[in-house]
Amino acid sequence: NPFPGILGYEDSVIPDTERALLSQHNILFLGLRGQAKTRMARQMIDLLDEYIPIVAGSEINDDPFHPVSRYAIDLIEEKGNDTPIAWLHRSQRYGEKLATPDVSVADLIGDIDPIKAANLKLSFADERVLHYGIIPRSNRSIFVINELPDLQARIQVSLFNILEEGDLQIRGFKLRLPLDVLFVFTANPEDYTNRGSIVTPLKDRIESQILTHYPKSLETALEITEQEAAINDKKKKKVKASDLIKRLIEQVSFEARA
């Protein structure tokens, strides 16, 4: 099982996720609370190579053979085969952002940094004055946006280009950054009417929509509760719960959801 600790998805969500990953699709996990959407996204880093080489000092994890940032391109032109290399562990190749109403385009994509321009005595037309947002900094990584409907429509629109073409534009700069990012989005359909929605063109650009679900059997539900309950040995000695009580509690949950 590529997703240890995820129970009840062996014949539904996990095969769908495997197919989406093999197809190099961006993924939307659509489901209610407590259905392991974010946990599955976080466990995807275990499928990555343990280490990858990057150009040392690069803000956006430039591939030494295919640099995209001005910093890495200039450094490789200057030093050639002597370009310093750093090794990035897979645990560092994961970015996550909770969609809230105050998230801006600058947070996600980037903006011009006037302080950097002043310190380096550079014009605002120079590529080196850019301050990269969290998405470019997640180049060659997995980037997760939780609760996508909460993201304002104009912010969702800013993701169109990177999802469709794999590149982005910052503040009208004529630069093309062909980023290598796997996007994973999570959304709760119950929240659509309360707080917002996913704009249709964005939904069209997310190639795989995977529906998560609550456990379908009582046995799976019992296993999940046993796994997730934070009960230490001291508590277990003091409190005894019969198997019948546990089953009744799970059955009540099943009936309530029905």
Name each model-derived stretch.
Residues N1, R195-S197, S208-A258:
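Conserved C-terminal "switch" segment of AAA+ ATPases
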